[in-house]
Amino acid sequence: MQNDTQNIIGVDVGSGSVRAGVFNLRGQLLAHATREITLFRSAGNKVEQSSREIWQAVCYCIKTAVANAGVSPSSIAGIGFDATCSLVVIGDNDAPLAVGIVLRDLP
């Protein structure tokens, strides 16, 4: 296991998948992981996603990328996060109040 330096994680949530990569501080990719997320299509051209599935995919990709990089979780100095595809509204108990609204759903 590499533990001689700090590392960073980049996460990208797209409309079809979640991706996470572990990088050293020189910007070198050490490992990455991807997980597809389901698009639900309904009448009226509505396109939605499960907020819970998105979060589960984020957690899976981060854990998998860190494990595949062979670095200690304690070596992670920061996380960059990008999500341009959806809106998630959560309630008081941190549970999603509705499905995610996807950019493709807009006219």
Task: Enumerate the predicted regions with their spans.
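Glycine-rich phosphate-binding loop plus the immediately following alpha-helix
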Residues: R104-P107
